[in-house]
């Protein structure tokens, strides 16, 4: 791992992180609603450089069609980005075996996100964490609410870019993946993705309370208060957003200032 980039993220575990997410397909950053209806948002290297300059704590790159389409890892893009930004990079999409983790780390990633492959082979998470360390391994969970109104809340895990239902309970799955060695959980609400209606705070809080590792809240950010809510109500350690950054609604600095003014510890630059 790149020690200088990890150090740049801030040493305090109490500091809440703001993480722009770059969903990539065909070499471009895109953004959709509920995992469909994708809109082009720009060049990944240029966008990454902009967020680095704005003071983002980390960046997350997700190749959203690698698993469903079966194509190779986005190594050239990661190599370009890693050469130009100085904050931790988490990369996911198309990771199928431990050797893929090594290839992405060699390309410049600091952490590797595993989603569909973890469901297909949970031992992959354990093996990757044992070999590279839990600090390198993020398990991404795409969850959709499966309970009817009035029933106890439940969420189901989906894989393959939200295309395939698994029957797995999201909270139980997060707990299992933490036990297998995941150092973080990247939790996306499919119901809220791209809607700008705010995080599914009930889901975020349920998973945050269930696991002993940091949870990154994802899916639904439409304004600055949503980010703060993810930390205060959802109890997330970090908040991830895309649309509000990609299309110029807010800068990372504006988000951090807003959270700091409300007593949330963030790294200000």
From Swiss-Prot:
Assembly, per entry: Heterodimer of HisH and HisF.
Compartment(s) of residence: Cytoplasm
Keywords assigned: Amino-acid biosynthesis, Cytoplasm, Histidine biosynthesis, Lyase
InterPro entries in alphabetical order: Aldolase_TIM, His_biosynth, HisF, IGPS_HisA/HisF, RibuloseP-bd_barrel
HAMAP family in alphabetical order: HisF
GO MF annotation: an example: imidazoleglycerol-phosphate synthase activity
One Pfam family named in its UniProt record: His_biosynth
EC number: 4.3.2.10
GO cellular component annotations of the record: cytoplasm
Protein name: Imidazole glycerol phosphate synthase subunit HisF
Stated role: IGPS catalyzes the conversion of PRFAR and glutamine to IGP, AICAR and glutamate. The HisF subunit catalyzes the cyclization activity that produces IGP and AICAR from PRFAR using the ammonia provided by the HisH subunit.
The organism's place on the tree of life at top rank: Bacteria
Active site: 23, 142
Catalytic activity: 5-[(5-phospho-1-deoxy-D-ribulos-1-ylimino)methylamino]-1-(5-phospho-beta-D-ribosyl)imidazole-4-carboxamide + L-glutamine = D-erythro-1-(imidazol-4-yl)glycerol 3-phosphate + 5-amino-1-(5-phospho-beta-D-ribosyl)imidazole-4-carboxamide + L-glutamate + H(+)
Pathway listed: Amino-acid biosynthesis; L-histidine biosynthesis; L-histidine from 5-phospho-alpha-D-ribose 1-diphosphate: step 5/9
SUPFAM superfamilies in the cross-refs: Ribulose-phoshate binding barrel
Entry similarity comment: Belongs to the HisA/HisF family.
GO biological process: L-histidine biosynthetic process
């Amino acid at each position: 791992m790149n020690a200088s980039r990890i150090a740049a993220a801030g040493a305090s575990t109490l500091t809440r992180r703001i993480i722009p997410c770059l969903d990539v397909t065909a070499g471009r950053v895109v953004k959709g609603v509920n995992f469909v209806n994708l809109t082009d948002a720009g060049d990944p290297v240029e966008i990454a450089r902009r967020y680095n300059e704005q003071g983002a704590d980390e960046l997350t790159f997700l190749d959203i069609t690698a698993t469903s389409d079966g194509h190779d890892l986005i190594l050239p893009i990661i190599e370009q980005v890693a050469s130009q930004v100085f904050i931790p990079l988490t990369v996911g999409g198309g990771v199928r075996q431990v050797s893929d983790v090594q290839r992405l780390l060699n390309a410049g990633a600091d952490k590797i996100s595993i989603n569909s492959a973890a469901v297909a082979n949970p031992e992959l998470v354990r093996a990757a964490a044992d070999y590279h360390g839990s600090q390198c391994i993020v398990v991404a969970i795409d969850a959709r609410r499966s309970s009817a109104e009035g029933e106890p809340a439940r969420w189901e895990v989906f894989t393959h870019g939200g295309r395939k239902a698994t029957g797995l309970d999201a909270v139980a799955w997060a707990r299992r993946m933490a036990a297998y060695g995941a150092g973080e959980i990247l939790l996306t609400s499919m119901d809220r993705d791209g809607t700008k209606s705010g995080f599914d705070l009930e889901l975020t809080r349920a998973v945050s309370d269930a696991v002993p590792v940091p949870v990154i809240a994802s899916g639904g950010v439409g304004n600055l208060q949503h980010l703060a809510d993810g930390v205060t109500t959802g109890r997330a350690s970090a908040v991830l957003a895309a649309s509000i950054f990609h299309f110029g609604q807010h800068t990372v600095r504006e988000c951090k200032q807003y959270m700091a003014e409300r007593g949330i510890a963030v790294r200000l630059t």
